[in-house]
Swiss-Prot record:
Domain of life: Bacteria
Gene Ontology biological-process annotations: translation
GO molecular function: structural constituent of ribosome
One Pfam family matching this protein: Ribosomal_L19
Function: This protein is located at the 30S-50S ribosomal subunit interface and may play a role in the structure and function of the aminoacyl-tRNA binding site.
One Gene Ontology term, aspect cellular component: cytosolic large ribosomal subunit
Record's keyword terms, sorted: Ribonucleoprotein, Ribosomal protein
Chain's gene name: rplS
The protein's name in its UniProt record: Large ribosomal subunit protein bL19
Family note: Belongs to the bacterial ribosomal protein bL19 family.
Length: 128
């Protein structure tokens, strides 16, 4: 492992602390809890939506979450190892055949639905 990769791994470990980031993929519905600072007040804001893209670049990894808010599509990019992220919870797994789901931007209603990934019996037993 070269020096830069080693430093990056140490930085990721330091950024995570005791937090754990669950495995998630494009198509999954996630709830991202974000620490928001407004003046002197700190609060946690939940952002729920579908992961439409994931960018794995070590410390610079990020993912885009899309949701429909008041009939308008809203996308937000999150840095995976940001200290502003309180937690990530996977609500449901989506079954998609693409790595980037940008085509969902052009769709609305039923055509924007994503099938749920069914977990096989063998895999469900190993996860429990």
């Amino acid at each position: 492992m070269n020096l830069i990769a080693k430093l990056e791994q140490e930085e990721i470990a330091r950024a995570l602390g005791e937090k754990t980031i669950p495995e998630f993929a494009p198509g999954d519905t996630v709830i991202v809890s974000v620490n928001v600072v407004e003046g002197t007040r700190k609060r946690v804001q939940a952002y729920e939506g579908v992961v439409i893209a994931k960018r794995n670049r070590g410390l610079n990894s990020s993912f885009i979450v899309r949701k429909i808010s008041s009939g308008e599509g809203v996308e937000r990019t999150f840095q995976t190892y940001s200290p502003l992220l309180a937690s990530i919870v996977v609500k449901r797994r989506g079954d998609v055949r693409r790595a980037k789901l940008y085509y969902l931007r052009d769709r609305s209603g039923k055509s924007a639905r994503i099938k749920e990934k069914l977990v096989s019996k063998g895999r469900a037993a190993s996860q429990a």
